[in-house]
Amino acid sequence: MNKRVYISADYDEGSGDRNVVEELNKWSTDNYHKVDFVDMAKVVSGSVSENSDCRKCDLKSEFNSQINASSAVIFVIGDKTASRTAGSGCERMYKEWFLCNCAPYKHNSSGLKTCKHMNTSPSDPNGDFDYINSCSYLRHEFEQAKKRRKKIIVVYNSLYKRESWLPSYMCEYKDVAVPFWVYDSCGNKVGNYQFIKKQLGYE
């Protein structure tokens, strides 16, 4: 049975962790690895971002929906993950809507606009992580997965454990986070499919 798994990673062109995401996505296109991966880049490039007035909060709301529909979330940790701030900066939690300005998502070029949330309410303690927040996209995804009690799998984009790469909000996972890359019996660098498979309950 295929499982839907959400991938959260740093997609920076020059120093991100796309190589891990590409390896994971390869597993979902063959007849051997029965996993349906949904990576953040696909969500960002989807219909919600095509709206000319798409804001950070709209993307976070869509991330919530995609995570809710997934059975597990894989967080790919690279050497720049802890310092990434994309998605942060919203001030709506502290100011009235007419005092807050934000830019539509970067695919659009409409410039700064006044916040569109005139009214807000406390988030449901049993519901989603509030999409109106000052978190980065990466932290938002983590908080949503944790609040929704999803299976969380943390891997380093490395052949070795890199605890210093973990963002502070993920410190509780330092003992269970593992390197994504391993050497096979022929000395080739490959993704640790056996670990991912076990974490997803396939054995």
Question: PLM features: residue spans?
Answer:
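A short helix->loop->beta-strand "cap" motif at the edges of active sites that frequently abuts
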Residues: 147-152
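C-terminal interaction surface of TIR/SEFIR-family domains
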Residues: 4, 156-203
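Short catalytic/ligand-binding loop motif for oxyanion handling, primarily in non-cytosolic enzymes
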Residues: 14-17, 82-86, 161-167
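Winged helix-turn-helix DNA-binding recognition segment
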Residues: 136
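Conserved N-terminal substructure of TIR/SEFIR domains
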Residues: 1-73, 77, 200-203
